[in-house]
């Protein structure tokens, strides 16, 4: 395996720290797939860890950085992971297993995302699981458990999985390259990628599978302040809207099977109509109680 770290135009000492910490030298590396990215300034190889590379490039945000890594990757499978996420020790092996057992049909695998706030982390490894003392991450622990241990499992079982978290996902590289990688014109690149992957494979009329394995656990930091949580949820909502607008022809379309008839309408109801309906409920119920209607 290889580890490719993408320095996405950072203006701090990230690149210098990587070069010094891992004894890296500038080395030429051929880009296998020319996906859309900002300018590549250089590639570096570790002299102490020959399978560790760093790509230095101009700032282009998450999707652009992921495309750079995919373009330089040489392995048939690629794992896209956020810099602040930690995979449990057997995570990659568990993620690779479905690809080996599915006769080439598997194109993407996701895992459970857990909240790392409050946990003991040393040397890049999670040593002890603890709850955060802050109530905001605690509420998100319950939310994430519901999402990843019930909803995603059910979606995967019915072949209607529309989202593999941007924090951690394993993909067949050839499929990503065929699709042109991640798109730059959406803030919900993880959702858009999987929806487009369904569309791409069904338009090609090829048998495929996108799976979720709950035993794969990736730990990540959740927003601990209301401002950060608000920005995160606004970004998720915007990403869902952008994806639905881009792929609106899939909604209710029998050509896309369960994805078009069930999964896409579910996103419309839950993510688009749900929030305003819930807000309306908060306003209507107290008024109805005051008027004696409830």
Model-derived features with residue positions:
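Long helical/loop segments within the catalytic core of UDP-sugar-dependent glycosyltransferases
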Residues: 27-67, 89-186, 201, 234-237, ...
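A conserved acidic beta->alpha catalytic loop
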Residues: 7-27
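Acidic metal-phosphate-binding loop of nucleotide-sugar-dependent transferases
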Residues: 11, 85-86, 113
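A short, conserved alpha-helix in the catalytic core of glycosyltransferases
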Residues: 175-178, 186-212
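Short beta-strand/loop segment that forms part of the nucleotide-sugar
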Residues: 1-9, 35, 55
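Short aromatic/hydrophobic "clamp" motif used to bind/position activated sugar donors
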Residues: 78
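Active-site donor/metal-binding and catalytic loop motifs
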Residues: 208-227
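Basic/Trp-rich segment in TM-proximal cytosolic loops or flexible interdomain/linker regions
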Residues: 153-160, 223-294
């Amino acid at each position: 395996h290889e580890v490719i770290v993408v320095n996405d135009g950072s203006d701090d000492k990230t690149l210098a720290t990587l070069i010094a910490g891992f004894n890296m030298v500038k080395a030429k590396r051929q880009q296998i797939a020319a996906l859309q990215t900002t300018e590549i300034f250089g590639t570096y190889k570790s002299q102490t860890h020959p399978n560790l590379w760093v790509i230095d490039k101009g700032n282009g945000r998450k999707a652009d950085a992921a495309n750079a890594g995919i373009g330089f990757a040489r392995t048939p499978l690629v794992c896209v992971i956020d810099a602040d996420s930690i995979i449990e020790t057997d995570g990659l092996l568990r993620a690779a297993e479905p690809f080996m057992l599915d006769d080439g049909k598997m194109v993407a695998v996701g895992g459970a995302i857990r909240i790392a706030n409050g946990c003991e982390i040393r040397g890049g490894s999670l040593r002890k699981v603890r709850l955060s003392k802050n109530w905001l991450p605690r509420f998100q622990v319950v939310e994430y458990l519901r999402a990843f241990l019930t909803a995603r499992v059910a979606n995967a079982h019915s072949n209607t999985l529309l989202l593999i978290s941007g924090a951690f996902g394993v993909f067949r590289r050839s499929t990503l390259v065929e699709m042109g990688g991640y798109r730059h014109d959406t803030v919900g690149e993880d959702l858009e990628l999987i929806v487009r992957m369904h569309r791409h494979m069904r338009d090609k009329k090829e048998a495929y599978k996108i799976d979720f394995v709950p035993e794969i656990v990736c730990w990540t930091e959740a927003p601990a302040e209301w401002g950060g949580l608000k920005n995160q949820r606004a970004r998720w909502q915007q990403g869902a809207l952008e994806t639905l607008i881009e792929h609106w022809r899939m909604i209710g379309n029998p050509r896309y099977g369960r994805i078009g008839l069930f999964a896409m309408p579910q996103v419309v109801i839950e993510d688009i109509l749900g929030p305003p309906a819930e807000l309306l409920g908060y306003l209507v119920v107290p008024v109805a109680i005051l008027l004696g209607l409830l």
